[in-house]
A protein has these predicted regions:
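Cell-wall glycan-active module
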Residues: 1-303
């Protein structure tokens, strides 16, 4: 909804003008979110009026969490995120919703509040519209999603003694990953968690899937778990792409220019985008070749 996005962006004046045109069943939550953002005297009353929506509307939850944190009640903010209901509608800005969850889940983990950290970080699915694949999302959204699922999986496995929950999180991590390194990492750790849960069948299945990426570190660890030798790795010459307008993607041209004129940070941002968007052998060969041409071996490592 338009108002949902306005509230998410803290565009309170514009949101106030549009609230009257929203659907009756969502209007109380929008009014409560607006009152909370404005620090209105009746904000708490508006939240009570919203009833169940107070815990299921992303824009209202975010407003309440921010208000609690600003008042110094970080534990209350984390508890709200951990105990919330399933979202009534997809988050208005997915990457920002995930950043909200990640910020508080990481803080909870750092403070030793492992159950809270898991319950915040593991609630990733209800924010996504039905039928939408995380693999198709932009880099920022996928990065925050994988950070959340990795945090939830590692906490479940290492701190809470819940390996079956860890399996589900690591499998989500792998499903959202595009590079062989990150995909094999998620599958390998899903296998480790399944083995710890005494589910040897599932563990073997995850190791099998990870071992497909035998050129990566975790793919090789998966082969070790399966007691298989390393296959013969075909030698592929890494040829740098021709840097000419119209013949290569814009991001490669931008990386080449950044290597000549930009800062190290600018270069790294472009190289990271190239590595994260690589999809297929040709892309990885081109990335490694470009790293050699531009004198940036770290791009080869990223890829």
């Amino acid at each position: 909804a338009h108002v949902d996005r306005l509230l998410w962006a803290s565009s309170t004046s514009a949101a106030e003008r549009w609230i009257a045109y929203t659907s009756p069943h969502r209007r109380p939550a929008f009014a409560a979110a607006l009152a909370t953002r404005l620090k209105a005297a009746d904000a708490d009353f508006k939240v009570q009026e919203a009833r169940a929506s107070a815990d299921s509307e992303a824009s209202l939850i975010a407003a309440r969490v921010d208000a609690l944190r600003a008042s110094g009640n970080s534990f209350g903010a984390r508890t709200l995120l951990a105990n919330r209901s399933t979202l009534a509608a997809p988050a208005p800005v997915l990457k920002d919703w995930y950043q909200l969850l990640l910020t508080h889940a990481q803080a909870a983990k750092e403070d030793g509040q492992y159950d809270l950290a898991y319950r915040i970080a593991s609630r990733v699915d209800d924010a996504v519209p039905a039928g939408v694949l995380m693999l198709d999302q932009d880099i920022a959204t996928r990065d925050r999603y994988t950070s959340l699922t990795w945090l939830a999986g590692s906490v479940a496995l290492e701190k809470l003694g819940r390996p079956r929950d860890a399996v589900a999180m690591f499998e989500r991590y792998a499903a959202a990953a595009k590079s062989p390194q990150t995909r094999s990492k998620g599958l390998y750790w899903a296998g480790k968690a399944a083995a710890k849960a005494n589910d040897t069948t599932s563990a073997s299945r995850f190791y099998e899937r990870a071992s497909v990426f035998y050129e990566s570190f975790f793919g090789q660890l998966a082969l070790e778990q399966l007691r298989r030798p390393m296959p013969n790795v075909p030698q592929v010459a890494a040829a740098a792409p021709v840097i000419a307008a119209g013949s290569v993607p814009d991001v490669l041209l931008a990386a080449a220019l950044a290597s000549k004129y930009g800062s190290w940070r600018d270069q790294s941002n472009f190289f990271r985008a190239i590595a994260l968007n690589a999809d297929g052998k040709e892309d990885y060969v081109a990335a490694v070749g470009l790293s050699r041409k531009l004198g940036r071996p770290d791009l080869a490592v990223m890829a």
